Amino acid sequence: MKYLIRLENTRTSRHEALLAFAPIPAGTVIGWGADEHSPDGIAYWTVTSCEEVAE
């Protein structure tokens, strides 16, 4: 199974999406990518939705 994960950047409110092989619950915060304005240099994203996609 594959899952479409929709993300919102916690600092910029930018939206992205990715495919994952396991579900990630909505509300989960993940560190993904770089953010030069973040103290630790990591961009943080909140999962806004997780949908199973047909293969």
Regions found by a protein language model. Name each.
Residues Y3-N9:
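A short beta-strand micro-motif
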Residues R11-E16, S38-I42:
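Short, surface-exposed beta-strand/loop "edge" segments at domain boundaries and coil↔beta transitions
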Residues R11-S13, V29, V47-S49:
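N-terminal compositionally biased, intrinsically disordered segments and leader/signal-like regions
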Residues H15-D35:
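Short, flexible N-terminal segments of the mature chain
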